[in-house]
Amino acid sequence: MDHNDNDLQGTNSSASLGGLDVRRRIPIKLISKQTNKTKPAPRAPRAMNRMPAKTQAGDEEEFDFNEEERYECKGGEMFGNQRRFPGPIFWDYKINLLGEKDDTPVHFCDKCGLPIKMYGRMIPCKHVFCYDCAILHEKKGDKMCPGCNEPVQRIEQCVRGSLFMCSIVQGCKRTYLSQRDLQAHINHRHMRAGKPVTRPPLEPVHPPIAPPPAEIPERFIMPPEKHHMSHIPPKQHIMMPPPPLQHVPHEHYNQPHEDIRPPPAEMSMAPPPPRPVSQDTFRISTRKHSNLITVPIQDDSNSGAREPPPPAPAPAHHHPEYQGQPVVTHPHHIMPPQQHYAPPPPPPPPISHPLQHPPQAAGTPHMVYSQAPPPPMTSAPPPITPPPGHIIAQMPPYMNHPPPGPPPPQHGGPPVNVSAPPPHHYNPNSLPQFSEDQGTLSPPFTQPGGMSPGIWPAPRGPPPPPRMQGPPAQAPLAGPHHPDQARYRPYYQ
């Protein structure tokens, strides 16, 4: 057995035994023929690598059986020799792969380019490399991520399939531990650019809707600066309720509003004055809401500046009368007519209104109240700008109702002003306050005579035709103004 072991070792380990193997093969073939059973015995050990012991110890039958095995083993050895000296291998034959596809994505390390089985995740920047590269990079003393050059606080070890990498934008490659976190990152970092685009259009949409309020705010802003009064509350009132109403009046008042703005700048303009009057009316109403009487006094100068233009559109005497009249009365007149009148009627009525309103201030406050509360009117001069919003809100209905002639006392032409509410809003005491404010507002309004009945008739006749012609309802309103004014004159006087 020892001899066999040596043979085995020799055949496996030494090349010299290879020659012996070759010699042994020859007798094996002879043995297979079974010509001489005795001769092969000595050669058998040569030809047999591991089986010689069996052949020697076993019977001939066993030897034959073993011989076949030797043959097989010999073939194996021959293949073994080929393995030792490999030749060209051909892979052009088909291979059928059995198994299921693994949906887990495989990422490649940006450092070594090999597929990552264990991730090394850079914590602050969330970029990943294979764990070996990440650790090696850290050992080098570099605390910067090799991908983004951001400082690295620590490195996390993650298993393949536990990370979700962002591939929406090339070069992002941030990784997250859940699909939800990845989606949140995409929405925040990559989809945000698109969302702003949608938002800007929305913003523009809102501005168009709010333009009427914007216009009113501009007017309000101008007077508030001058008056330093609490115009913000009136503006708020105007902004909140008026927008819908403003839209309606704007259709009629679009031009008047535009005119109103210029008139304040250009007091001499005749057409603008009526519209400024409407502004004054609005201001008064705003004051009414704010219940600030003292503030209007500061605004008187502003209101006066704007109010004088309204008389210009009215007949010439209206202007002088207005100058004589206190500014307060003029604003009052303007306030009720504009509120009751639709945007179109305001220009002519403002002229007549100043006439009517002064008498109202003196005699019957209820008349003025119909359109705007007199107390706000007295203090209205400063808040005049904010009231336009409220007045506009009221005006739209009045604009629709301009035809009614019964309220001529306020606007003469537009009977809407005739409504009883104005008296309630107006306070006789507030009228005198307006007269005081009138002096501050402007020279034309400073005159106390503004209250005189004479002023009323003058604006009724001449101003209505020019202004009223623009708005169809104004011309008829002018006529009613005179009779209504006559009725109210005794009260105001």
Swiss-Prot record:
Cellular component per GO, a single term: cytoplasm
Region listing for HYB domain, in residue ranges: 148-206
Catalytic reaction equation(s): S-ubiquitinyl-[E2 ubiquitin-conjugating enzyme]-L-cysteine + [acceptor protein]-L-lysine = [E2 ubiquitin-conjugating enzyme]-L-cysteine + N(6)-ubiquitinyl-[acceptor protein]-L-lysine
Zinc finger (RING-type): 109-149
Pathway(s) per entry: Protein modification; protein ubiquitination
Job of this protein: E3 ubiquitin-protein ligase that mediates ubiquitination of several tyrosine-phosphorylated Src substrates. Associated component of the WMM complex, a complex that mediates N6-methyladenosine (m6A) methylation of RNAs, a modification that plays a role in the efficiency of mRNA splicing and RNA processing.
Family of the protein in this entry: Belongs to the Hakai family.
Listed name of the protein: E3 ubiquitin-protein ligase Hakai
